[in-house]
Curated annotation (Swiss-Prot):
The lineage of its organism: Eukaryota, Viridiplantae, Streptophyta, Embryophyta, Tracheophyta. PANTHER family: 30S RIBOSOMAL PROTEIN S16, SMALL RIBOSOMAL SUBUNIT PROTEIN BS16M. It is found in: Plastid, Chloroplast. It comes from Lactuca sativa. Belongs to the bacterial ribosomal protein bS16 family. The keyword Ribosomal protein applies. SUPFAM superfamilies: Ribosomal protein S16. This is Small ribosomal subunit protein bS16c. Gene3D superfamilies: 3.30.1320.10. One of its GO terms (cellular component) is ribosome.
């Protein structure tokens, strides 16, 4: 199963995160399938590759809680069909 989750980058006390599509059995810093976004909590900047995110969501990828909040804030779920916005 594939998940959309955060991968920590940056230096100590200055974390930035990549939003990646990754197999659930991989560790947090493991090899990802594709980088689909970027999130900097300090500067509150977000970059999302929306077509890639929609592709993985349509294929059944599940976003983690934090990634789901980021996607809701960016209104990515409005581009999906209404019956596909339910996640476990």
């Amino acid at each position: 199963m594939v998940k959309l989750r955060l991968k920590r980058c940056g230096r100590k006390q200055r974390a930035v995160y990549r939003i990646v599509a990754i197999d659930v059995r991989s560790r947090r810093e493991g090899r990802d399938l594709r980088k689909v976004g970027f999130y900097d909590p300090i500067k509150n900047q977000t970059y999302l590759n929306v077509p890639a995110i929609l592709y993985f969501l349509e294929k059944g990828a599940q976003p983690t809680g934090t990634v789901q909040d980021i996607l809701k804030k960016a209104e990515v779920f409005k581009e999906l069909c209404p019956n596909q916005t339910k996640f476990n």
